[in-house]
């Protein structure tokens, strides 16, 4: 999947996620084959937060590339301490800007293979169903979406 295609798809998923009435959800964009290479958008009680290199449940964290630290800092991310992740509460509400920020954070932080197919994971079942519909609408095909959930 090329960056423009991935960002358009991500915008559709973000539109559904941000419109959700639920609080306390997470939406994780990750790179298949690179465990721990991810960006998590979450909506805790304090507002929206982005975390680069969050890790996921029992998966090991993947430290971001040292060359990415300047880019992350320039884009409002802080961290890199004991856990090695970077986070920001300065989350753009424009869908195109948010999709680009998430995609660029993965590109700078983890250098995934060019044209990688992103995967999403979420903690809100309604988002999974709605995201599948957004993916199908975008792709105009009837394949499953690589979205994972847990209970």
Kindly give the residue locations of the regions a language model identified.
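Structured alpha/beta or helical-core interaction and ligand-binding surfaces enriched in interleaved
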Residues: 1-151
């Amino acid at each position: 999947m090329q960056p423009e295609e991935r960002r358009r798809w991500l915008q559709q998923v973000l539109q559904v996620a941000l419109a959700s009435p639920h609080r306390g959800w997470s939406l994780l964009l990750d790179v298949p084959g690179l465990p721990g290479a991810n960006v998590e958008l979450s909506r805790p009680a304090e507002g929206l937060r982005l975390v680069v290199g969050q890790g996921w449940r029992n998966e090991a964290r993947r430290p971001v590339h040292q060359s990415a630290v300047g880019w992350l800092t320039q884009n409002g991310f802080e961290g890199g301490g004991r856990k090695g992740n970077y986070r920001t509460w300065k989350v753009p509400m424009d869908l195109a800007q948010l999709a680009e920020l998430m995609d660029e954070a993965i590109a700078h932080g983890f250098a995934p293979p060019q044209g990688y197919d992103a995967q999403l994971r979420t903690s809100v079942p309604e988002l999974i169903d709605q995201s599948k519909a957004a993916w199908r609408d975008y792709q105009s095909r009837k394949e499953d979406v690589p979205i994972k959930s847990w209970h």
